[in-house]
Amino acid sequence: MPASSHQPLDLAKFTLSSPTEIAQHLSNIAKHGHMVTVFANKGKNFILTRLLEVDYQAGVFTFDWGAEEETNTQVLNSERNVFVCSPEGVKTQFVAGQISQVMVDDRPAFQCRLPEQVIKLQRREFFRIQTPLGSPVFCRIGDFNQRSIDLALFDISLGGMSLWLPGIDTPGFDIGQQYLQCSIDLKPFGTLALGIEVRHRLTARMRNGNEAMRIGCSYLNLSAPMETIIQRYVGFLERERRAMVG
């Protein structure tokens, strides 16, 4: 296969390193009450929480106590913790160290040192939106094993898309595999004609208990007109989703 033309995301462009900027950004998250997921013990445990206070002078922040005491104990024993949230479509992620227990308004809470860096992805192309089940979209791969194959889309963004494989062991979709004769009809906005490269694989368990394989792909040879088609399609899905939730 030809060499990959995919350029890795330069996270340095989206990283806050100034203590003042970090404290301000986390304060805004706390002020608006956005939900935050904390992954502890190398992802073995997690809690859903909210940031409570950010103390720039002391260099610490506090966040809500979890609902399950056993999980809270495991979080307190974790030396490295990953915080993730998406306030107003802006994905925020940072790593913090050991967490301690404190009291806030006579209630238990967690406290941690402010992180040294915060990744703040503002570019909308890195946020994928799921395609509707009622109007499935397919990617036709014309150069698959000397024939064509249609794969259903799970989600799409300007940065890439996820596709369902027809079987858990479907061959030809290892990481790094490229296909150059692909077409995707994003009705009513237009058709994409491009290449794709498999970037990751994910095993998912369906509602019926069966396992399914999903692959994440980046685009190859994405032109400006095709970017516009994707933008319009994603915007259309976002408007429909907002209308459904009122």
UniProtKB/Swiss-Prot annotation:
User: What biological function has been recorded for the protein in this entry?
Assistant: Acts as a flagellar brake, regulating swimming and swarming in a bis-(3'-5') cyclic diguanylic acid (c-di-GMP)-dependent manner. Binds 1 c-di-GMP dimer per subunit. Increasing levels of c-di-GMP lead to decreased motility.
Q: Name one GO molecular function term.
A: cyclic-di-GMP binding
Q: Subunit details for this protein? A: Monomer. Interacts with the flagellar basal bodies.
**Principal localisation:** other
* Name of the protein described by the UniProt record: Flagellar brake protein YcgR
Keyword Amino-acid biosynthesis belongs to the record: no
Entry annotated with the keyword Nucleotide-binding: yes
Q: Which UniProt keywords apply?
A: Bacterial flagellum, c-di-GMP, Nucleotide-binding
Gene encoding the protein: ycgR
Question: Which ranges carry the PilZ domain?
Answer: 122-234
| Record localization | Bacterial flagellum basal body
Cellular compartments per GO CC: bacterial-type flagellum basal body
A single BP term in Gene Ontology: regulation of bacterial-type flagellum-dependent cell motility by regulation of motor speed
Give the family, as the similarity comment puts it: Belongs to the YcgR family.
So which domain of life are we looking at? Bacteria
- A Pfam entry, by short name: PilZ
The residues forming a coiled coil are none
